[in-house]
Amino acid sequence: MRSRIIGVYALLSAGASQAERVSEPFAKVGYWEITTENHSTCVMKSLYPGKVADDAEALIIVYSARQKTAVLSWITQKPKLPALTQSLDFELSFLKGRSLNSLWGSRPFHIEKSPHSYSFTHAFRGPMDGERFLRDLASHDALVLFFGPGMLTSLPLKASDAVTKLRECSSKIVGQDAFDGLQK
């Protein structure tokens, strides 16, 4: 399952036009792995093994400090959903202790199907949404997705230090780009 999720992750981060993906480790914080992709994007990902072999999930967050945008992808093998189209709206919430923060409301998630899994992706456009998402990710205990009244998933985060490293990674790329621009 891990290799299948990593395959979907590679498609998300590299883009269809890339001939070859270059992924370099940046940091490992708890169960979060932070990498640079193609020397231009920073990604943090966490794999969640399921109770049975076909029940694993993953969260992938892509962040650009230059654009102040973030992308969230939830990957699962067997989503409990109606017939899938190209997009579905999920309620995005965060849990802290027993308190559910549902201020994000309904968000459209683009659907990609691979042979062994589904990827549900939402882009937080603009600095306000991107920064707010990272703050909530860092300060809450779990990310929760609902479809209608039913909960799809609740994944533990423990992401405060990982988000700090993700921001550091992205800032270094912006700094390197500025340095490269001065060298030309």
Write out the residue ranges for each language-model feature.
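Enrichment for repetitive, rod-forming helical segments
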Residues: 9-11, 143
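N-terminal signal peptide c-region/cleavage motif recognized by signal peptidases
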Residues: 14-16
